[in-house]
């Protein structure tokens, strides 16, 4: 029997799931921050906004952003510890026993498939069921965040008290992805991820991937760049350009979906398609036109 102290003071999937999102947040933020600092032309052409707009349009000092993000991450770790204590340390998975259960299920319900594809139980156990769990977790966290996010916009009092904090950053950048009012960070991000984890029945190992990917996706959505071969922007329509529109005055009541899909925006009429040109591209075209003239 593993005690709570042992669970939280040894390197195991539970502690990794608490620490890895914090690490990936600052590593990814540092990477995009470095690109912003060096301003190499090979990367600059993929900017969404000209660099001077970050200082001109954002109304929060970067040190205040750092403090707010660290506080939210502290809250996330505390809630994660509480959840781990409530659940207890998970028993080791007996894969042989699990495979016997899958084989018994296929033998009883899908005997014809088992004859044609004897590998079906193993495929289901290793790939199909985990993939469904992840997809369901994505759907749950998206649904949770969409409706809370939209409510915080439509309720003017709550917007001014809470969500307006995040919109002080009119030009998103990576490090500011989790710059929120503490209440918003707790309800939308921390509780949203926790509810999705529980609803999908993720294992601690799966939780490491889910929490880390969700955090990386959030940073990438605020990074301020549209890189052509960024896998997170290639495979998800809900990306940096899409979310940037929500931070602009003309897209303020659109594109509430986050962090993975755009499903609810399409269904409920709050979808705004990304524009063909970014503000940075428009500025560069104007510069080139002046040079020609």
From Swiss-Prot:
Record domain Fatty acid hydroxylase: where: 136-270
Predominant subcellular localization, coarse grouping: endoplasmic reticulum
Pathway(s) per entry: Membrane lipid metabolism; sphingolipid biosynthesis
Keywords, in A-Z order: Endoplasmic reticulum, Lipid biosynthesis, Lipid metabolism, Membrane, Oxidoreductase, Transmembrane, Transmembrane helix
UniProt keyword annotation of Acetylation present: no
Highest classification ranks of the organism: Eukaryota, Fungi, Dikarya, Ascomycota, Taphrinomycotina
Domain of life of the organism encoding this protein: Eukaryota
Protein name as catalogued: Sphingolipid C4-hydroxylase sur2
Family per record: Belongs to the sterol desaturase family.
Subcellular location: Endoplasmic reticulum membrane
Endoplasmic reticulum recorded as keyword: yes
InterPro entries recorded: Fatty_acid_hydroxylase, Sterol_Desaturase_Related
Residues annotated as transmembrane: 18-38, 68-88, 127-147
Disulfide bridges in this chain: none
Gene Ontology biological process terms in this record: mannosyl-inositol phosphorylceramide biosynthetic process; mannosyl-inositol phosphorylceramide metabolic process; sphingolipid biosynthetic process
Function: Involved in the response to syringomycin.
Organism: Schizosaccharomyces pombe (strain 972 / ATCC 24843)
Membrane topology category: Multi-pass membrane protein
Gene that encodes the chain: sur2
